[in-house]
């Protein structure tokens, strides 16, 4: 066992990924059910988009050579043959010396190779005067200029979002092959933990971590209905729960029992599981230091801290990367960072990478970052935070006015 020194969580996790079995089973789903799923194949375009040349402006479809030398003093005068309606394929061609009105997005008629903007024209029935010349292709979008037939649209391993769904629909692709969602078993541990709908007796506390983790990973994974959800600090109960979970789950997570006192029990139970190994125990981060990452039969086991804030940070930095990897994602770091200016001075322990809960004022440029100074176990500030400011391990804090990297929540 060794401490994992995190500068980039995804970068530091890369060496252990090969110990885990990725999801290989796939299924076909409608694009209307594909948001948040991991694409299991490369998606290529089967057609040119647009399929025909279109106008990018309101104006007149012309043969560009008919406008050569046109100016306000010596306009080109073309015979108006008719109008093109949006969404219709023109039924007539234009010959030299002719033009047709065309709206933005209209399909160019045969014989036209450019569009004169309406601002540079004047209709004098039955003619239209053109006050400037246009080059071939001007104010048009050509077939395949947006998407070419055979073009790679979305690569395998992409986590599909709204923008991808829109592209698929635009390209006429209505079903996609995605990886099966990884099955995730989530447990909370500890004699002091009671269900959220209970009134805790003195010395007890409601389970915050279980619901939080289910919300965090319920989009990308299938959360299993395990029993018991809360495991007491008893070896037999923990061993039974983990063995049963590993029979049905792709990933097992448990929070609590990973810090001093009960952590030895968790480590001991994991070691007793078939084909298991503790890959690392403890991270040089705060909050989130007492984290266990293990493997059993190619399946990840994550032992997360008991404090909700510590559990959240560890699950975000470590759990997210592992779950996305197992699910088939090709993303290396599924986080969004910004840079801002810290408002007040803060201190941190050297050698520890600290993630500080902060409020962000986006009305300033660059954004102003205000620390929410509190203990790692305080839950309220986590819910109110806009982001986590990263203090590098080589620093002993940040001075007011110093630039800081912030992971958005």
Residue map of PLM features:
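Solvent-exposed alpha-helices and their adjacent loops that cap or buttress functional pockets
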Residues: 53-55, 70-73, 91-95, 108-110, ...
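Short, glycine/charged-enriched hinge/interface segments at domain edges or termini
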Residues: 2-4, 60-229, 373
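Short, low-complexity N-terminal leaders and the immediately following helix N-cap/first helix
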Residues: 1-74, 329-357
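Short, hydrophobic/aliphatic alpha-helical segments
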Residues: 34-48, 88-101, 293-294, 298-300
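Electropositive phosphate-/nucleotide-binding environments in soluble metabolic enzymes
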Residues: 3-10, 14, 25-28, 32, ...
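Helix-rich terminal scaffold detector
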Residues: 2-10, 174-304, 308-314
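Flexible glycine/proline-rich
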Residues: 27-32, 41, 87, 147, ...
């Amino acid at each position: 066992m060794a401490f994992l020194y995190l500068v980039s969580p995804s970068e530091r996790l890369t060496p252990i990924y090969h110990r885990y079995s990725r999801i290989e089973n796939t299924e076909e789903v409608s694009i209307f059910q594909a948001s948040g799923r991991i694409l299991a194949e490369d998606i290529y375009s089967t057609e040119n988009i647009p399929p025909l040349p279109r106008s990018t402006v309101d104006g007149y479809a012309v043969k560009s050579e008919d406008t050569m030398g046109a100016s306000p003093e010596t306009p080109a005068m073309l015979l108006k043959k008719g109008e093109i309606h949006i969404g219709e394929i023109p039924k007539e061609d234009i010959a030299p010396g002719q033009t047709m009105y065309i709206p933005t997005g209209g399909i160019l008629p045969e014989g036209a190779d450019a569009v004169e903007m309406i601002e540079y024209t004047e209709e004098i029935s039955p003619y239209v005067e053109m006050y400037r010349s246009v080059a071939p292709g001007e104010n048009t979008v050509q077939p395949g200029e947006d998407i070419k037939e055979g073009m790679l649209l979305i690569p395998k391993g992409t986590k599909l979002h709204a923008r991808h769904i829109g592209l698929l629909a635009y390209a006429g692709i209505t079903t996609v092959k995605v990886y099966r969602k990884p099955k995730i078993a989530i447990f909370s541990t500890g004699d002091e933990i009671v269900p959220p709908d209970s009134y805790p007796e003195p010395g007890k506390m409601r389970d915050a971590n279980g619901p939080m983790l289910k919300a965090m990973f319920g989009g990308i994974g299938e959360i299993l209905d395990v029993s018991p959800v809360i495991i007491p600090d008893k070896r037999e109960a923990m061993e039974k729960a983990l063995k049963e979970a590993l029979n049905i789950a792709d990933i097992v997570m448990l929070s609590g029992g990973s810090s001093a006192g009960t952590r030895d029990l968790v480590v001991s139970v994991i070691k007793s599981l078939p084909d298991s190994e503790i890959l690392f125990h403890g991270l040089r981060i705060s909050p989130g230091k007492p984290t266990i990452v293990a493997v059993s039969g190619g399946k990840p086991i994550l032992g997360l801290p008991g404090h909700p804030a510590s559990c959240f940070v560890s699950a975000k930095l470590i759990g997210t990367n592992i779950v996305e990897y197992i699910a088939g994602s090709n993303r290396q770091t599924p986080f969004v960072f910004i840079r801002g200016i810290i408002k007040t001075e803060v201190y941190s322990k050297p050698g520890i990478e600290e993630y500080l809960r902060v409020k962000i004022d986006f009305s300033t440029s660059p954004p102003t970052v205000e620390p929410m100074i509190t203990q790692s176990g305080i839950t309220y500030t986590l819910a109110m935070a806009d982001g986590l400011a990263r203090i590098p391990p080589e620093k002993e804090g940040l001075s007011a006015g110093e630039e800081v990297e912030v992971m958005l929540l």
